[in-house]
């Protein structure tokens, strides 16, 4: 076992002993553990850290550093280095089980067969042990003598009661010897909580300095109700990558995965927008990201601490409230019967109505929320301090093509106060991709439904083009005769390596004229005598294709055929704009075609 007494001696020789020392408080029993339990817990954290290093295939980490603890807690009070995953107080039994599970993961990686068997056991994010679930109402006591922010605690409790069937009852007095399950809210060193109900005694939930936002209080209460962190789910590798090069090696244990058997999900998938998700730079040693989302469009979505997400609430309701309503409603789009109102469905963001089958209520100035996509480009836009919900429907069998053509938001990560959320996936119960500092790198929904949510403040705005895809999709009913009818696609003449752009302009005399210009691909410093001819463009319109040519040891490529496709659409990096009634494809930040991209051709053999 590792001894921490030498660390304490060094700590007390430093000037930090004359100020507040979180580490000294912790190992001296002034934190969430008694002194002996604190030292035992840190020994097990060291074991866990080394196991995690083995799993990740990196050198064995250094021992814990007390000085690092002080800076970390001051800057991020929900990332306490000597607690599991930064803010979780575990019992001895829970810690032993996690170490066992991490050992299982290590050996599973040694065998693809074992890894497969381990993987199919389930996808979970909440404690599966029924003994750790609460009975309602949950008694709680606010220890004002500790300096805890009473209003912050009450707001967090009220939020969970508003969204779920969970109920709490406030106690007027508290005894440390009371043999009663209860939550005691204190102002400790940082933010922390146990996982679920852990004993027949009151358990502490610390809402310390820097922990008083509604989302953070809800996060800690979420742990007490049984939540693990979202990025600790067994299936997290399908959704995020852990960037170990940016994690200080002594914090590797903060990125462990739970086993499938220790958590239960209730069919609610991985949610990037969960209030239980780490932010992108959690436990960073470099200031760089430690978590990268597999779909880069969700990078600015992870780590919000505003409020529980729809999926967070859904898990709690499924865990605790399934027997609340006896009636049946055909809830749509990921909605479910509201345990606080059994006559209506609880709807995911963007949706409303009794059955979640229409767009949610819009603020004045948003326009209609339920929209039907056609084969022609249409536009939605909004600006200012509004919340707008748009549900764009394409015909069944088609998809929704979209392009965000303009956006002005506060550039923060994660996107929390103002952003455009685009849910292009299949499961609308999970938060969509949020954009406040970037544009989407995707332009097609997975189904025939696209959900767009604008959350604005003064000065914010957005504009988004949409249509259904493909533009040749037939919306007519299929024929019942034995004759087979085939609709020929629209024929577009093959275009040579030179491209022609036609724009309509208006003179001062209000007469319309048409100007046609022909432009060859941009030239480079390489003599054209050294280059072969340009290849045919790989697509016929919309800047969707490229053409290439060989110039000595280089190959040059350039976008081509940037005239809009039928129905008015363009491929990335172009977007469709109109000028005086004529549409064309424009590349952001440029009014001329891009110079060819060059690379050295890799020859085989």
From Swiss-Prot:
Q: What organism is the protein native to?
A: Caenorhabditis elegans
CUB domain location is 366-469
What does the cofactor field's note say?
Answer: Binds 1 zinc ion per subunit.
Any one Gene Ontology cellular component term annotated for this protein: extracellular region
Question: Which subcellular locations apply to this protein?
Answer: Secreted
Question: What's the protein here called?
Answer: Zinc metalloproteinase nas-34
Source organism's superkingdom?
A: Eukaryota
- Span of domain TSP type-1: 525-566
Pinpoint the EGF-like domain residues.
317-357
Q: Which residues form the signal peptide?
A: 1-19
Give me the residues of the propeptide, which is removed upon maturation: 20-124
Query: What enzyme class is recorded for this protein?
Result: hydrolase
Summarizing the function annotation, the protein's role is: Metalloprotease. Required for normal hatching and migration of neuroblasts. May act by degrading eggshell proteins at hatching.
Question: Where do the record's region annotations for Disordered lie?
Answer: 479-526
Question: Which lineage ranks, top first, belong to the organism behind this chain?
Answer: Eukaryota, Metazoa, Ecdysozoa, Nematoda, Chromadorea
Q: What are the residue boundaries of the Peptidase M12A domain, all occurrences included?
A: 124-322
GO annotation terms (biological process)? hatching; molting cycle, collagen and cuticulin-based cuticle; neuron migration; proteolysis
Classification via PROSITE patterns: ASTACIN, CUB, EGF_1, EGF_2, EGF_3, TSP1, ZINC_PROTEASE
Q: Name one GO molecular function term.
A: metalloendopeptidase activity
**Which cofactor does this sequence's record say it needs?**
Zn(2+)
Q: Which Gene3D superfamilies match?
A: Collagenase (Catalytic Domain), Spermadhesin, CUB domain
* Gene behind this protein: hch-1
């Amino acid at each position: 076992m590792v001894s921490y007494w030498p660390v304490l001696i060094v700590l007390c020789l430093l000037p930090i002993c004359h100020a507040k020392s979180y580490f000294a408080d912790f190992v001296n029993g002034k934190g969430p553990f008694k002194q002996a339990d604190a030292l035992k817990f840190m020994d097990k954290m060291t074991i866990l850290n080394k196991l995690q290093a083995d799993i990740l295939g990196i050198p064995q980490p250094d021992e814990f550093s007390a000085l690092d603890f002080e800076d970390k807690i001051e800057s991020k009070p929900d990332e306490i280095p000597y607690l599991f995953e930064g803010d979780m107080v575990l019992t001895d039994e829970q810690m032993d089980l996690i170490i066992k599970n991490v050992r299982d993961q290590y050996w599973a990686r040694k065998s693809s067969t074992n890894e497969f068997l381990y993987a199919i056991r389930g996808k979970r994010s909440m404690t599966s042990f029924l003994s750790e679930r609460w009975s309602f109402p949950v008694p709680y006591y606010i220890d004002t003598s500790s300096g805890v922010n009473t209003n912050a605690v009450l707001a967090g409790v009220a939020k969970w009661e508003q969204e779920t069937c969970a109920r709490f009852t406030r106690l007027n007095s508290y005894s440390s010897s009371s043999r009663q399950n209860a939550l005691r809210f204190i102002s400790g060193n940082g933010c922390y909580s146990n996982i679920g109900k852990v004993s027949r005694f009151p358990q502490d939930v610390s809402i310390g300095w820097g922990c008083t936002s509604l989302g953070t209080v809800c996060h800690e209460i979420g742990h007490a109700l049984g939540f693990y962190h979202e990025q600790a789910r067994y299936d997290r590798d399908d959704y995020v990558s852990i960037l170990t090069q940016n994690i200080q090696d002594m914090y590797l244990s903060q990125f462990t995965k739970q086993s499938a058997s220790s958590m239960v999900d209730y069919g609610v998938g991985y949610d990037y927008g969960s209030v239980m998700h780490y932010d992108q730079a959690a436990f960073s040693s470099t200031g760089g990201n430690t978590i990268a989302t597999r779909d880069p469009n969700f990078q600015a979505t992870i780590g919000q601490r505003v409020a529980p997400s729809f999926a967070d609430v859904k898990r709690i309701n499924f865990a605790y409230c399934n027997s609340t309503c006896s009636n049946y409603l055909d809830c749509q789009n990921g909605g479910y019967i509201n345990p606080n109102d059994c006559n209506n469905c609880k709807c995911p963001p963007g949706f409303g109505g009794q059955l979640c089958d229409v767009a949610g209520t819009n603020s004045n100035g948003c326009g209609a929320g339920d929209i039907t996509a056609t084969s022609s480009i249409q536009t939605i836009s909004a600006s200012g301090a509004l919340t707008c919900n748009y549900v764009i429907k394409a015909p069944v069998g088609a998809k929704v093509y979209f392009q965000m053509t303009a956006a002005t938001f506060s550039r923060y990560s994660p996107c929390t106060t103002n952003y455009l959320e685009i849910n292009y996936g299949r499961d609308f119960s999970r938060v969509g991709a949020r954009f406040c500092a970037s544009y989407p790198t995707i332009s097609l929904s997975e189904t025939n439904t696209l959900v767009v949510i604008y959350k604005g403040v003064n000065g914010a705005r957005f504009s988004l083009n949409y249509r259904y895809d493909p533009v040749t999709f037939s919306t007519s009913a299929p024929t019942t005769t034995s004759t087979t009818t085939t609709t020929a696609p629209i024929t577009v003449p093959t275009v040579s390596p030179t491209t022609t752009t036609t724009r309509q302009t208006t003179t001062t005399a209000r007469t319309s004229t048409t100007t046609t210009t022909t432009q060859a691909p941009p030239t480079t410093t390489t003599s054209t005598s050294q280059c072969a001819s340009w290849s045919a463009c790989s697509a016929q319109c919309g800047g969707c294709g490229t053409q290439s040519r060989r110039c000595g040891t280089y190959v040059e490529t350039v976008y081509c055929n940037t005239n809009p496709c039928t129905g008015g659409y363009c491929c990335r990096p172009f977007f469709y704009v109109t000028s005086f009634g004529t549409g064309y494809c424009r590349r952001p930040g440029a009014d001329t075609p891009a110079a060819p991209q060059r690379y050295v051709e890799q020859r085989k053999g």
